[in-house]
Each structure stands twice: as structure tokens, then as C-alpha cells.
């Protein structure tokens, strides 16, 4: 059943969807890792593909930038297409000195400056957390693959350009491992609709050190993260 944002049939998607923010990255993942894949959505250029990874049916779909976009697509995938497991595979910023560019970080939970989870939780704080089984599994797989990962809490912000030094100091004080624009929203939707979700990101920007990867590097240099996510759902 198509929606205003996803022009696909009911069975076009796997029950497992990996979600990068960038549609170009979704296309890259499908072409590099999936066999017998087909494009199942191009509405609003939010590209989606379904194919097979080691005989497991997998879908890849971009979610765009920010909580509103990511929440919209995850909600429609869950309600209209029976998706049961979502892994965000994206980029994030870092503030801690021990976290470097290209490090892989996994979000146990995510606080946010958005009001989205307060809206759904009667204006109270909501603990937006990942699914435990997914965390346990991906950490186990990372050890087998000898891929270093760091685990901690994210801060999901509505503002990409923010030079608030006071806030940066707070993020460091509370040991925030990654700063992104989607995770808290995805975890909120997943919790409300009773499905599994996990956010795994590669550090593309170090906010306090003012280091960053180029747009070209962001497109295709995150293979370890992608392979880790794919292996974790077999």
C-alpha cells in the first residue's frame, strides 16, 4: 500500500530496513552489497531498495535529515509495510577527545533538544533507548569482525549549525558519544509502535576540534559500519 511519501506495494519491503540519511548512500549500499536488488521507491527522491545479502532479504531506505523526516519514514514503514527492525546507519558529530573521525559509535539512548518525545509523552521526559537484543548482537558481531565500536548516549539536535559553547561543555560533561539529528525520534517511534530499532553511526565531524570529512568521503567511506549492520541482521 503506497503512502504520500512511499510509493510501494505492501510486500516490496523486507521486515528489516537499514536507513542511511542520504539517498545517494542508500543507492551505494544496494549496489555494493545486495544481490538481485530492485528499487522500490523514488518518491521525493527518497530512494529505497530491496535485495538479498547472503540470502537474507534486506531493504535499504534513506530517511532524510532531522527528526521530522526520519520519524515520518520510520512510522510509515512500520505501520504500512510491516517493518519490524530498523537500523539507522548514518553519520554523527563527536565532542569527546577520545572519539575520532571515522570511529563507529552505537547509541544506547538519545536525549534531544526537540520537543517531539515530550509531545508523545504528555510533556514529560521520555527515555529514548535502543533495543537491547540489537545492541548485544551488534557488539558480539563487532568482536568477531574485529571492528572497534564505542557505545554510549547520543544527543539528537534540531540545529546542525550551533556554536553554543555552553551546550558543548554540557555534552562533554555528560559523556555524550555522538551528536546527530535523528536517533531520538527514531527510538521514540519504535518504542511507541513496539518494534526494534538501533542507531549506529560513523563520526564524520569532530565538533570541538573542528575536523570533518568531505561530502565525497561521507558518501562511500563507511563500509565497516555498513558491513557490521548487515552482518548483525543475518
UniProtKB/Swiss-Prot annotation:
The keyword Glycosyltransferase applies. It holds the Pfam family PNP_UDP_1. The record marks 218 as: Important for catalytic activity. The keyword Transferase applies. Phosphate binds at residues 21, 25, 44, 88-91. It is an enzyme of class 2 (transferase). InterPro entries: DeoD-type, Nucleoside_phosphorylase_CS, Nucleoside_phosphorylase_d, Nucleoside_phosphorylase_sf. It catalyses: a purine D-ribonucleoside + phosphate = a purine nucleobase + alpha-D-ribose 1-phosphate; a purine 2'-deoxy-D-ribonucleoside + phosphate = a purine nucleobase + 2-deoxy-alpha-D-ribose 1-phosphate. One of its GO terms (cellular component) is cytosol. The active site is at residue 205. GO terms for molecular function: purine-nucleoside phosphorylase activity. It comes from the Bacteria. Its EC number is 2.4.2.1. Keywords: Glycosyltransferase, Transferase. One of its GO terms (biological process) is purine nucleoside catabolic process. A purine D-ribonucleoside binds at residues 5, 180-182, 204-205. Belongs to the PNP/UDP phosphorylase family. PANTHER family: FI09636P-RELATED, URIDINE PHOSPHORYLASE. Catalyzes the reversible phosphorolytic breakdown of the N-glycosidic bond in the beta-(deoxy)ribonucleoside molecules, with the formation of the corresponding free purine bases and pentose-1-phosphate. Homohexamer; trimer of homodimers. This is Purine nucleoside phosphorylase DeoD-type. It comes from Buchnera aphidicola subsp. Acyrthosiphon pisum (strain APS) (Acyrthosiphon pisum symbiotic bacterium).
Amino acid at each position: 500500500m503506497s503512502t504520500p511519501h512511499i510509493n510501494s506495494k505492501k510486500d516490496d519491503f523486507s521486515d528489516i530496513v537499514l536507513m542511511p540519511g542520504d539517498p545517494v548512500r542508500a543507492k551505494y549500499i544496494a549496489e555494493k552489497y545486495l544481490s538481485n536488488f530492485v528499487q522500490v521507491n523514488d518518491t521525493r527522491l527518497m530512494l529505497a531498495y530491496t535485495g538479498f545479502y547472503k540470502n537474507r532479504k534486506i531493504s535499504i531506505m534513506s530517511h532524510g535529515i532531522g527528526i521530522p523526516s526520519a520519524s515520518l519514514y520510520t512510522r510509515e514503514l512500520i505501520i504500512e509495510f510491516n517493518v519490524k527492525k530498523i537500523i539507522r546507519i548514518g553519520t554523527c558529530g563527536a565532542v569527546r577527545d577520545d572519539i575520532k573521525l571515522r570511529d563507529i559509535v552505537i547509541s544506547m539512548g538519545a536525549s534531544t533538544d526537540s520537543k517531539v518525545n515530550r509531545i508523545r509523552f504528555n510533556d514529560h521526559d521520555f527515555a529514548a533507548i535502543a533495543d537491547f537484543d540489537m545492541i548485544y548482537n551488534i557488539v558480539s558481531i563487532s568482536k568477531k569482525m574485529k571492528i572497534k565500536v564505542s557505545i554510549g548516549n547520543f544527543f539528537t539536535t534540531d540545529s546542525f549549525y550551533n556554536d553554543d559553547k555552553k551546550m558543548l561543555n554540557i555534552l562533554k560533561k555528560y559523556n555524550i558519544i555522538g551528536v546527530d539529528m535523528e536517533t531520538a525520534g527514531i527510538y521514540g517511534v519504535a518504542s511507541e509502535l513496539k518494534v526494534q530499532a538501533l542507531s549506529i553511526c560513523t563520526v564524520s565531524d569532530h565538533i570541538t576540534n573542528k575536523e570533518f570529512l568531505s561530502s565525497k568521503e561521507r558518501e562511500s567511506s563507511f563500509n565497516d559500519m555498513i558491513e557490521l549492520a548487515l552482518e548483525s541482521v543475518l
